[in-house]
């Protein structure tokens, strides 16, 4: 009870304290006359509308076909084995239609009848089981090999589009899933 009484009295004492009012003079204001008006020409709005950048169409089939031919002749590649074609990664600063590139790779391999290709539905189910989102382009070779092991694939085809001084290249690597050994590697200019 004494504490409450002490707090109330302290509050009343502090509330009754008043600081003396400061007697400061306001800052002097000096009027400034405007200078001569300069004539300005109004800026006319431009009627020119900029064109959006054109999407460059890339002939993925023409780029991929020679690489698949090379891969089919590579030493150590056995026909009839199961292949996981990983989606193409875009390591450029521009936009690319990597889905079309991946489809071109799958079509070229299917036409050669070299491998049994893991279906998209199996890949989708495996990604869900492993907790990988469908937007995850795997990005790392280790993730690609892990997914291939889960799917019991024998090979993984890892593909990356990279850019160096304006020159874009498609690099492909065929890897053995058991060891991670790169059996074949090839690249081709895109531009």
From Swiss-Prot:
Lipidation (S-diacylglycerol cysteine): 17
Keyword flag Signal: yes
GO cellular component terms attached to this protein's record: periplasmic side of cell outer membrane
InterPro entries, sorted: LpoB
Region ranges (Disordered): 25-48
Cystine connections: none
GO BP: peptidoglycan biosynthetic process; regulation of cell shape
GO molecular function: enzyme regulator activity
Keywords tagged on the record: Cell outer membrane, Cell shape, Lipoprotein, Membrane, Palmitate, Peptidoglycan synthesis, Signal
Lipid-binding residues (covalent, N-palmitoyl cysteine): 17
UniProt family annotation: Belongs to the LpoB family.
Function: Regulator of peptidoglycan synthesis that is essential for the function of penicillin-binding protein 1B (PBP1b).
Name recorded for this polypeptide: Penicillin-binding protein activator LpoB
